[in-house]
Amino acid sequence: MNNGKVRIYELSKELNLDNKELLAICDQLNIAVKSHSSTISESEAESIRAAAEKLAATNGTSKKELNATSHKPNSAPAGSRNRPAPPQKQQQILEIRKPKILRNTTSNAPEASVANNQIASSEANSPAPPRPFATPVSPMKPTAPSRPVPRNLSETPQKPAAPEAEPEAQSQAPAKIAVEKPEKSAQPRPGKPERQPKPQLVAPPSRPTAEKLDLSEITGAPGEKPILKRDRPRREDERDQAKPRVAKPAQGETSSAPVQKQARPAQGLVKPEQRVNRPGAPSGDGIRPQRPVRPSADAAPVATPPRGVPGGGRGEAGDTAAIAPDLLDLKRPTPPRLAKGGKKWQEEEIIDEIKEKAGKAGVKGKRVKPLVEDDFEDEDLLDEEGLEIPATVQVSLSIARPPKPKAARSASAATAAPISSPTTRGKRSSHNNRDQNRRQETEVKRERPEKVAVTGAMTVQELADLMAVADTEIVKILFMKGMAVSITQNLDIPTITLVGKELEIEVETAEPEAEARKVTEMIEVGDLEHLLRRPPVVTIMGHVDHGKTTLLDSIRKTKVAAGEAGGITQHIGAYHVDIVHDGKEQQIVFLDTPGHEAFTAMRARGARVTDIAVLVVAADDGVRPQTVEAISHAQAAGVPIVVAINKIDKEGAQPDRVKQELTQYGLTSEEWGGETIMVPVSAIRGENLDTLLEMILLVAEVGELSANPDRNARGTVIEAHLDKAKGAVATLLIQNGTLHVGDILLAGSAFGKVRAMVDDRGRRVDIAGPSFAVEVLGLSDVPAAGDEFEVFDNEKEARALASDRADKQRLSRLLQGRVTLTTLSAQAQEGELKELNLILKGDVQGSVEAIVGSLKQIPQNEVQIRMLLTAAGEITETDIDLAAASGAVIIGFNTTFASGARQAADEAGVDVREYNIIYKLIEDIQGALEGLLEPELVEEPLGQTEVRAVFPVGRGAVAGCYVQSGKLVRNCKVRVRRAGKVIYEGVLDSLKRMKDDAREVNAGYECGIGVDKFHDWAEGDIIESYQMVTKRRTLALTR
């Protein structure tokens, strides 16, 4: 006996069996083992080998036994004696069988059949088998270690389980019918949940098994039929029928899923259907020929159900009766699919026919017409009809009987309310009306223009409207060109030109109007009879640091009443000065504009509302970029220019050089025979200021500036901001008419009543005449600087106009927030674009506008600035919340925190940056954008080495080198040049100095170099060493 010990797992390898199978054999032979690592004697091993050989010959049945015993503990040798009591093990076997069917249909079919055999035998033993074993089936879906060992039908004839073969075939037969004929598989389902899983269980294995099974299925399976007889969701099953039936059985797992779904739909449908079914059996026969493929097979299995239908002989008739109403019920959803005109009449006719239980082919033919509208909606309606058939038929009978006169139709529409939901009827009629309207609209199509003028970027929708084509047509054209666009996306001018070429429309690029150009004429025809002289509005313009504000301060200090405490605080950018000219007291209103390049829009606005432009040029600095820009603004606005050459008291001042430079821009001094007045002044010393003021008044007289003070005020918003105490505050320049406290004012989209007015000296005033600049309180919102304002007599009219303008503004803001196609399409397709979210709060609207304009100048090809909010006013807790939600940075320019905002920012961890110099703000944001850019790899040279000798080493070679310049570093990148050409690029793998490994070798030393992938060294080769370093990119590179 004890010739030697053998471990179970070694024996399993030798016999090419699983450990579990071997343990099962040990159980059968009463060999006591605990696990696969237990040892047995050689003689026991021999007996196992013999048993394994028998297994190999009859592997089907052995597998069955193995499956049965695989869940038993191997330590009990008495397990094999208990084997003949299968009923005790039934549930365990079922658990093994069901999941295998669901998952591995091909490989596990035989095992499933074996399980079925055992179920069948259990059925033979117990009189009412379906319920006891149906309940364990449902929880078994997820479990299943399935073994993918292919086995064929050879199992069935080999073991004493031969008599069980027939029940197996029977069990598979219903399954096949359940899958292939959804209408029938659903029929048996209405009632008890315990029985639903059975058809699902058996369904999948029948597909992969060989054809023989089909024959055995057909031959008869009364035993298992009852389970299939239940019918539940007819509608879904027949919907499945509409799709190709052959495709569904082909998929094992997917086919089982629909069966489960079919078990769920409304069970309430079953009862009314049964009522109609019994008498409708003959009509069902009439419909039956539509499925000629397997009539006999279907009839046989469904014939036997003991679902309370007595007699197997009546099975076929009962079956067809059950199917016939199915079909009728199924077809019920289709009538709404007919042409829209006769829907109601046809539905009622169909319901009458169901009531009479007569399946008429004519009606059926009508129903086959294709769907026009939403079939799901109609089907739901008809589901409700099916539940209420008895009541609805009585109502509709009297109406549906007459032929089809229009009167009857209208009557039926009224009384057939319970049958077809009125809401959907209304929807459909409204659809019809809409369709008719659309047709009428399309008939009045605009002709496509031959030429269009474009000033800037446009959305696809706007372009489609301009070119009189469908927006989808433009999207299609661009898609064919490789550009994916949406209807609301902005297209730039080159893209618009491309679309125009495709549509054969000439696209002209109209030059955008200069911002400084005067758009609206403030004086109307009715004012001509009432015009009076008004003070001139003078804008001081020039380059930054050329002394504009100093000049203004100097004029004010000399001309403002000396009694004012501490001089005048400049509340607003516009103020007036009283001077005596020709013995009369006259006024001049000055506007101060910033000189920094960011404030272009402000300068343009100043030029637009002004009458005379004073151009300040420093005598020591000459004409600068903003000087040129100011000249162009004034010329675009068509206002006369008076040049003040400032800083003549400084050393190095060259007034004549300034005059010379100005001639290049069309400004020639009167002294030199030109028309431009040029006055040399010193703002600090106050030299020649009176001369400058006199010249301004002289030019004003020539211009004959006039306005009508007896009308409602009109003018322009110079500046606006949000004050925490006063609310929205706007600085208005009145250009015509007179403004009173209490007037209804509309500025842009901001509407309000003038509550108070404050002049430039801080005094409250009740009346402001032409050319006056005042601060106005009482507006509902902060208007944009540069908006025109107007006073209305009718408040309702003003409100309506304000609402309309607000909508337009909102739309334009949305369009601006959208990125244009060219800047984004390529990057968006390659990868995610990086964005910097900003919330910008400034002291006044003009500052905010200037900052936004500057930020737009920063290149944004790879990183985008996304302005979530730009407004004038304090930084509030609302801003902090918005920043926290969107991950934005808050930029504050010359503004403060509202109470509680700073603490909220600290708690939320929001980054708030405060600035009072615009240069610094722009630099910081540009730096933040550069930080978002991916750093680029740049080659940094290390040194140059010459090969002096080559030493063969093994299969390769080592180069003896001399470092001529720089250094060599191990693992650096090298480039080998021979006769000026690069012959190899790679990594320096080995570096030695005097037989020792070296990390680096400096210039003037010799060393040995080895490269794994290159051995073709030659004396005189030059080795260039370099390394790749990351370098921060700048936005200039992304242009």
UniProtKB/Swiss-Prot annotation:
Chain positions covered by the region annotation G3: 592-595
Region called G1, residue ranges: 542-549
Region (G4): 646-649
UniProt similarity note: Belongs to the TRAFAC class translation factor GTPase superfamily. Classic translation factor GTPase family. IF-2 subfamily.
Record domain tr-type G: where: 533-706
Residues that bind GTP: 542-549, 592-596, 646-649
UniProt subcellular location: Cytoplasm
Protein name: Translation initiation factor IF-2
Listed Basic and acidic residues bias regions: 178-197, 226-243, 432-451
Bias type Low complexity, positions: 157-176, 408-423
Region of interest: Disordered: 39-347, 400-452
Pfam families membership: EF-G_D2 (PF22042), GTP_EFTU (PF00009), IF-2 (PF11987), IF2_N (PF04760)
Organism, as annotated: Nostoc sp. (strain PCC 7120 / SAG 25.82 / UTEX 2576)
